[in-house]
Regions:
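Solvent-exposed coil/turn segments that connect beta secondary-structure elements
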Residues: 55-57, 137-141, 191-193, 199-201, ...
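Ordered core of a single globular domain
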Residues: 397-404, 477
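Bacterial N-terminal signal peptides
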Residues: 14-27
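Structural boundary/hinge residues at secondary-structure and domain interfaces
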Residues: 33-131, 135-180, 223-275, 285, ...
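Flexible, glycine/threonine-enriched loop-and-boundary segments that flank and lead into catalytic domains
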Residues: 450-469
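N-terminal secretory signal peptides that target proteins for export/translocation
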Residues: 1-12
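A conserved glycine-rich beta-strand in the N-terminal activation segment of trypsin-fold
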Residues: 179-254, 464-549, 554
Length: 595
């Protein structure tokens, strides 16, 4: 898509230097956009297919070096080894050379060029590759003059000055052994703004939009586009990097590949805009939003959207010591719809076989008679064991699915009630597991256990290492677990008992990042680190036994996992689905729990 290796090289170098060195900046005071200086997005047309915008990056990164997660990152053995290696030495030598050339520290120079505002715009073309223009607003009026002079010093160019709309711009072509080579590069300096592109028409468009007189008949600028405004408004204001994409502009590109076009275009036509952003708050947080048409949507998707909007209190009943927890809002119709995605004969045969097996287990059809009783909430947790026992797994898991299992009127058609169907099917699976285990281990047979607690019935197998598989049926939930204690704890948990919702780290992440998202996944990496530290020796022995490895090598692997989890205390992934829009957020953070 980008034709010139030279242009690619300069963009990569500039972006890399900006992202790597800006966290090291100190208090350089940047100039602000004055009233007569245009926004960069006002200098490009609304026909762009992709726009990457970085605003006031220096302010966003100002506090990063003093944050806890960045301090931990610098203290990681991996980072220290890199700092002691040859690549870092080369980087330092190159930085020192550039510092001598530009006459000031490189980090200050990069901040001067890119710390305020940068825009990279890509415009699809009906013939040929897309056109690209890069714009950046520097802190000082002479910044770009020094950059262009340095560029000419490092690489010989033939420079031709041209003019349009009362302003001059340059056509630059690389010279090698006295001969010009490579594609043209066009640059124009507008005060503190520099625009660079391989396409002369894109530079002319920038010049035309910067002219003081209105341009009759010219297409709207990007900042006037309703789609762009709505897409950017869907992102948090704190985003340092923002991306906008217009699906309509890329349809011709998709059609160039007939195979992809046939699969993607029906869905692509429904997309109206896409936006994404990166936020540096508590850590690194990414956001994305997709807006789509609401007409002609399938009924299962509409039910899924409705299910996503229903409230849930599941986090108030999940254990506080979970290292991994999540919840999804699922409409039963969506599960049924999945069967129709693959229309091949093999897929149809497989589904028919699956239906016969489940009907034999449950005494009723899974999709027609069981799933319609499911409620939207489906969640689960992974909880570490303390202490780790030699013959049991180091973690336990619990899966919770909300079901309407209240007793209905007595059936007269001979078909079992839903609760009886689920109980019979799950009990059969437990019995199969017990028979398989006992046939190989007659000395320590697995034994079925049953416990009744009010409206809850729990059944599990003892002596089936490394777990004690269990299921529970209550009036509102179907529960599956690796240990019956998790089912009992879920059933018995009261409002005053410790729960995930009130765990300080989860509460901070939830309130700051995912409160409006009904689908979420949460990793308590701080608890995982503590578990790996406390149970390091028994974990090493256990994993070494299972994987038939030497304990020292397993110990080193666990140390690397713990190191990987060091910078951030939590990670999360969440989605919010509303009519016409889907939003995602994901991040790794170390929140200050004192705030």
């Amino acid at each position: 898509m980008i034709r010139s290796p030279s242009f690619r090289r300069y963009i990569v170098r500039w972006m890399f230097a900006m992202l790597v060195t800006c966290p090291l900046l100190s208090g350089l005071c940047l100039a602000r956009v004055s009233a007569d200086e245009p926004e960069l997005t006002s200098l490009i047309g609304e026909d762009v297919g992709l726009c990457v915008e970085i605003r006031d990056l220096r302010s966003h990164l100002r506090d990063v070096p003093s944050t806890e997660w960045f301090r931990r990152l610098r203290e990681m053995p991996l980072v220290k080894r890199w700092q002691q290696g040859p690549e870092f030495a080369k980087w330092q030598a190159g930085q020192a050379t550039l510092t001598l050339l530009i006459g000031q520290p490189l980090d200050q120079f990069v901040s001067e060029l890119f710390g305020e505002s940068v825009v990279l715009a890509v415009s699809p073309s009906k013939s040929g590759p897309p056109g690209i223009v890069l714009l950046s607003r520097a802190a000082k009026d002479d910044s770009w003059d020094r950059v262009l002079a340095l560029w000419d010093q490092l690489e010989a160019h033939e420079v031709q000055t041209k003019s349009a709309f009362g302003r001059s711009f340059q056509r630059r072509q690389k010279k090698t052994n006295g001969e010009t080579s490579g594609p043209d590069l066009f640059t124009v300096k507008l005060g503190r703004i520099l625009a660079i592109s391989e396409r002369e028409e894109l530079i002319l468009d920038v010049l035309a939009r910067s002219a003081s007189a209105p341009n009759e008949g010219r297409a709207k600028s990007l900042d006037q586009s309703p789609a762009y405004r709505h897409a950017i408004a869907a992102l948090p204001e704190q985003c340092a990097v923002r991306v906008f994409a217009d699906p309509r502009r890329w349809e011709e590109e998709l059609r160039k590949d007939p195979a992809s076009a046939e699969r993607l275009l029906p869905l692509w036509h429904k997309l109206e805009w896409f936006s994404a952003g990166v936020e540096l708050r508590d850590g690194i947080v990414g956001h994305a939003a997709v807006h789509h048409e609401t007409s002609g949507l399938s009924a299962p998707w509409q039910r899924f959207v409705e299910a996503s909007a229903t409230p849930s209190d599941l986090a108030t009943r999940l254990p506080a010591d979970a290292v991994l927890a999540g919840e999804a809002r699922i409409a039963p119709e969506l599960l049924n719809w999945l069967r129709t995605l693959d229309e091949s004969e093999k897929a149809k045969t497989d589904w028919q076989t699956f239906g016969k097996v489940t009907r034999g287990l449950l005494g009723r059809d899974l999709f027609d008679d069981v799933l319609p009783h499911a409620r939207p909430s489906l969640g689960g947790v992974v909880v570490p064991k303390r202490p780790v026992e030699e013959q049991s797994a180091p973690v336990d898991g619990l899966l919770v699915w909300q079901f309407d299992l209240s007793h209905g009127p007595t059936r007269t058609d001979g078909q079992p009630e839903l609760r009886e169907s689920l109980d019979g099917g799950l009990l059969t699976l437990l019995n199969f597991a017990a028979v398989a285990h006992n046939s190989r281990n007659p000395v320590a047979p697995a034994t079925l256990r049953v416990e009744h607690r009010d409206t809850l019935t729990i059944k599990w197998l003892d002596s089936l290492p490394p777990y004690r598989p269990a299921f529970g049926l209550g009036s509102e939930h179907l529960l599956l677990a690796t240990d019956p204690r998790l089912i009992s704890a879920f059933h018995d948990r009261k409002a005053a008992d410790p729960a995930l919702k009130s765990e300080p780290l989860f509460a901070a992440v939830h309130s700051r990042h995912i409160a409006e998202h009904s689908h979420w996944l949460f990793l308590n990496s701080r608890a995982a680190r503590e578990f790996l530290t406390e149970q390091h020796e028994p974990l090493s022995r256990q994993v070494a036994h299972w994987r038939k490895l030497a304990p020292p090598s397993v110990s080193a692997q666990l140390d690397r996992v713990r190191e990987f989890l060091t910078p951030f205390d939590a990670a999360f992934l969440a989605a919010r689905i509303t009519p016409g829009e889907v939003r995602f957020t994901a991040g790794a953070v170390t929140p200050d729990l004192r705030k």
